[in-house]
């Protein structure tokens, strides 16, 4: 069986105060990309997850183990992941892989969403990759109509950026908003994104509260954003906790033209807003 695990971007991310469990409340619009990891699943003599290029435990392996702990009876599986989503780039690659494994047990194991939330903040939204308004600490997912077709240029940067470090820096900088403000923002995002508009139509609403923290830790984030603007991107933003910077475009042709002008080997052009076939 071949399945795909699409990357995601955060079109916006509004940060709330720390919660008692140490996590942060947030309000964000997630959308899938055509960029996806490719996963081969086959029966085997034992469960194993193979992911060349990823050091240490893989979230997909944890997802498979969690399914077994909940009593999933399907025969042992070999899960081999061909990474196409840059690792540690804030594009949700590990979460996408974990969600793809969880989807294998849909209808067979109860409380899949609960397992997803235990695995990580980005996993619940990736169970059904689609434009979604995400709140809580990532576990509350409200799916929205697919947006008008558009495209992105991604500049992943290098070296990764620890989510934990970015949130800690955000706390140090005092970037969190009151919970009541998050609720008002969620209502506004639901209104502007709820009828299938392109994000370019409501770009003024798209803010990432983590951007100052990411730029503080990685000055090259700001440099990448400036480069995209100079190359003509109509709207530029940081996705998630970074370090990936995105330029938003009406179509892939415009995105490709800007990527060519940038002249960077790491630039990725892809369609946004819809998951690829085979997800």
Regions found by a protein language model. Name each.
Residues 89-114, 125, 129:
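DPxDG-like acidic metal-binding loop motif
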Residues 47-49, 55, 128, 133-235, ...:
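Conserved, helical-rich catalytic subdomain that frames metal- and/or nucleotide-binding sites
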